[in-house]
């Protein structure tokens, strides 16, 4: 008789846990509050966009990308069959990054792998060229990066976790360009965080992983899917799970955990207005932190003290808007980062990566390209209405985002974006408008302020049959990403394997990889750290 596992939440974390468990013979059911599975990663059929005989236009919460440092999620994808291959084979490389500024843009392309410290300095300098930053400040920033690369793990947790990125790079005393491009650039656009409060341990090392990918990842900076996410990944994933006997129950909202003694006895699930008890041997919560916080009652906190401070974790907004174009505008074979945009925009032009998608069969047949844009700063006033996105209507968000894109791309007599080429648009429906001045977000993003690690639990809680598979769990990845959710799921599965006495192979875990050239320096820094000395 196999053990029964109830997984709460059908996003990447929940589905990853279900996959790892089902592959090891567990009896798994997944409960998701939405009718559709996939969480933030899922595709969204644009309502009322399909003409008779055609498919709806594909929308999304935000574009998916798979940086070169992702290891856990690609490994899972390699085991999901799709058209005789695997969904991993539906990933294709992007090969360039567009660093766009108002009136100017720059392409960053891969370089050879640095072999010496001089090489590393030269490569870092090339990344930050043409940004209008004084050379002495660029060199100071490079020194800060090298400090991170040569610091031991113990110092990272004891010191850098509690230092804001803004302070670590001494941004307050530097030029506006330094503050804007090196201080705020990545934190705003990629992780929706403020440099003034972001943990150096998180932001600094994720910055480094992304930069290492820019410099020397084989094949390209990152991968993207070769079609809409559901078609290329989520639908085959759900088919694979059901083929292994996983039960997928949508429209099922977790309302409460019920304890008996030290164990979870049941979870109460709301299904269409009817509350039903769900019992299992083990429970995996793959719910986002803002939902899980509401389920952690005083008795749960007493039984699992590591969950007592989830309400101190913070979230911000990072949501997408898609622009549907009459004629495709490829821009660059990769992502674009709009450094001067008040709303911290990033984008990808998708058709070039979707060779097998028949665009004539989508919508009314007139769409020739899709520009998918993420908005990561919802609190800064825009350039059209002078209002932050949270105070804008949906139409104003569209107009503002489009204007910010044009201010970066339409330069030097070249006009890749024209109003006449824009057919329609779609804003992530998680952005909800009860009225124009009270916009809410149904799926915010966890952020990592300095010192917040202390509030984040391990995947294995003090309740013997309750485990966590969400991106707020402590992981190597350490960031609210699909990779972090997948890694958390693996950790929860390994804990269940231990608790059940299973002899099945444990799910593999990968620490973030860093260049070997710096290993002796990290070992030397460990000696200094143990002696109570600063990094030297």
Feature locations, PLM:
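C-terminal segments that line or cap access tunnels to active or ligand-binding sites in enzymes
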Residues: 215-225, 280-282, 287-456, 462-487, ...
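Glycine-rich FAD pyrophosphate-binding loop
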Residues: 22-49
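Dinucleotide-binding Rossmann-like beta1-alpha1 core, especially the glycine-rich loop
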Residues: 51-144, 155
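Conserved Rossmann-like nucleotide-cofactor binding loop
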Residues: 13, 36, 290
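Active-site/ligand-binding neighborhood in enzyme catalytic cores
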Residues: 141-265
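Active-site-proximal substrate-binding core of FAD-dependent oxidoreductases
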Residues: 495-536
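N-terminal Rossmann-like FAD-binding beta1-loop-alpha1 element of flavoenzymes
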Residues: 3-30
